[in-house]
């Protein structure tokens, strides 16, 4: 009560922020007559004037009123569009390192031109981030005339572009691209072998469109660049044959139900667990297939990879559904993004899941991959000096933006008041009744000439609705991941009178639905339209537009609630743009995933007690509240997962930053001989210490062992025993100095053969290659550690603290291993002529190029619950004899800590 009273008196934080910014808007409006008087050339010259002022020490913030006034005037001249005052407010919010919540149709694309221009004046570059390639290209091409009029260059960063084209795009003042491509370019730059191969500049200002989709929906999925591992496709096929013999246990959590099933599914946590009965059957079937020996256990250390295959196959069959989670196209399994409904070409699930799905669908199984580099969006976007974003729906996630990204959310008012009617939810007992009610609603509304957009949560559901509409004889368009090439065209005409459009979550985000359809699309379809044709098209459109307004505007039907209220709001936001009329309603059934998993059985029990007949719906505030609570539960669970992922990834992030900084320093220098000399001393000291303990008696020295080690690891044959026999006065310190001096002498002789320049080149190549190889193995070891670390909780230890402690020890061991491997490689390599060194360098580059071609870019399904699932199935995951040792030494497990066990 007191808070409400204080808010009434002083206004909310949002109100106070907008009040402060409105003063600047008044200044910009006051400058408008002055800007209108300037000629085109004088207006263009303002850009160079602003740049000169920044170089003299003026801050970018002090230029806001003038710069925004210049962009507004340029927009009037180039596009014939004037920024509204609310768009100026939005631009200031975006410059203020905040999230601007602007409703659909309020002109976010035009708003973005203001902060993009302002922050590009410093010459450090601006990255505008969009959710897909189509929007990146569209926005870049749409805004290019404005920016080029003001003397700014525009670049587009698309997947598959050659490195020179990417460098050119990043060198532009303003670069448009997708979140994935920016992230992958960052990882690729940190795998480059020369400074010339890098494409990105220092990360300065990122302006993220649909910021909720990128920083929240996709935050759980790290970007991973991986290379091929060994082929195990046959094993996936064999295990896949066994899974159909297993029966799902329906109600494992019931006290009275005696389960007959072989595995249980936890839909909430997306986990699959074998029951005791299932384990016995699986072991019998594996023995029958000749995969496992009789009497062996699936949980024995030797079968841990087999358990991995069984778990992956079980998850593929029980949790992943065709046309919901993925589609099969041209013999390839393509992931469907659960949040946008778009296909993710080239992306693959990790942990063998993608191969298991390929086996299930009977398509060619591609090799498993090994992680070469990875980063989460959370950590990538926090690398920018300045970050801001805009979306139509951010307020529900304001706490997460603030706690993880330190970004405040500011709700920007609409230009015209919103008059859309959001009708209460209707809840039916069954899916069939719900679909029938939707069809009736569509019939009724289209009869009045009202356009309808039907939002579904998966391709499968969109096709179910489509089939029913076809049966009812209702003409309609379908927009889902299978047909997304037509996306913009379908969305542009979804506002036609009586048009019916079915869309998955992709729902053409970024494309406005114009009431009466898009006259611009009709004009664009003509080859060389005359003025008369354009005038006629506009006149026809006006008639249609008025008819749709009279019918009540665009009606939105949601076929079920999404896990997140924000995505429901996005669907609703397709209607009622720019003060247009519109309406929306969600239809639910007790068979919907959200209701089944989160709304308790009491709701359906209550509905039966109320004596509901087939086809009847319940419309009650209590039910709406229960649904909102269910959504809140899912949102908070997903937030916890993202937060937990970030806390674990922060540990890896510190290490990643250290490695990438060291690697970039290496790339930027041509001579690393000082570093080599320094680490040679460390390596030889540590090696000699193992055989001649410091300040020890001569009887404790292992001279034969030391001689053998120096010969095997450093190609250094030294008669140490002979020296000690002939020179009794030779003590420990002088012996150490002599061994090091001999190693330096041998190395210098090699250098004399090939020349100093070639040797420096070779040293740098060896250091980079060794660093990359060990970092790759370290990432795999960190994955192993991460998957089993939650089990430490049973020993009353904090898994996060244990993970920090052990990963730090592994990192320190990796750095020691790096020194050793570099000196060992440089000492053992036999070089004769400069041509041979050049040939070796060529071979290394060819290998790097081959690997680059085989790299997979993937979104890992790194839900904390999924990681825990695999670890819980396998116990603390055992390491194969030929796997890299988790200690980070770079050696195989059997040659390192495997000896101890």
Curated annotation (Swiss-Prot):
EC number assigned by the record: 7.4.2.8
Q: How does it sit in the membrane?
A: Peripheral membrane protein
Print the keywords alphabetically: ATP-binding, Cell inner membrane, Cell membrane, Cytoplasm, Membrane, Metal-binding, Nucleotide-binding, Protein transport, Translocase, Translocation, Transport, Zinc
Cofactor remark: May bind 1 zinc ion per subunit.
Please tell me where ATP binds in this chain: 87, 105-109, 512
Binding of Zn(2+), residues: 885, 887, 896-897
HAMAP family from the UniProt entry: SecA
This chain's protein is named: Protein translocase subunit SecA
What is the scientific name of the source organism?
Salmonella paratyphi B (strain ATCC BAA-1250 / SPB7)
Q: What is the lineage of its organism?
A: Bacteria, Pseudomonadati, Pseudomonadota, Gammaproteobacteria, Enterobacterales
